[in-house]
Amino acid sequence: MKGIAQTFRSDLLAGHVALVVGGTSGIGAAIGNALAAVGAVVTVTGATRSEVDAARDTPEFAARDAVVLDVRDDAALRAVLDDLPRLDVLVNCAGIIRRGAEHDVRIFEEVLAVNLTGTMRCCALARDKLRMSPGKPGGAIVNTASMLSFQGGALAPGYSASKGGVLQLTRSLALAYATDGIRVNAIAPGWVRTPLTQALQEDAQRSAAIVARTPLGRWAEPADVAGAVVFLCSPAASFITGAVVPVDGGYLVA
């Protein structure tokens, strides 16, 4: 990943072991590749075999391994963690959105089960391994919040509620895990060029409105988010925990 390599030392996280949950596409894939670019040994997960196989086939794929994981499955998550020799970095990117359908309580619950409870499950089950991290400055967790952690989404009440929950979960676990030497932070991406936003990108009027409101005047690229994650996992962020970092070009403050 050229931009990451130009910004950070290639050995910044040398020897560190990282797990990127939901790391086979979009923002998660960029994060996995960025962590690998700075020396980490990375495993990424995807929800289905087809997602994992597609990730492996991309020219940019830099992780050591890609495995299937349903974040709702305790046993499956334990198996993934048991296969790792150690764990220094956990990044939680697994998430779903069902725009227009989330007012159905069943769909609402499905979204929370992945986005919020899944994030908690990953943090809780990885805690013991992160506690034993010999890396400097100790174990690090980065969760994925959203600009919808801070504002409502009429078509996505489940997604918005889940991301608001991730924000408060991050702050709560930062307090709870501090005595273990584990830092817990989150990123809150804005409008990012990923497959999930493809329809918006192709809608000239709506895309122009997004860019017009964004002070930095463009869509984010996945690499923009990945750079923030690398920083939060690095020694430069050794005294940062409980932070939720917007990566939105100023959208929320405009």
Segments predicted by a language model, with ranges:
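Active-site helix of classical SDR
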Residues: 123, 162, 170
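Short, small/polar-rich loop/turn modules that mediate ligand/substrate recognition or access, typified
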Residues: 178, 183, 240-242
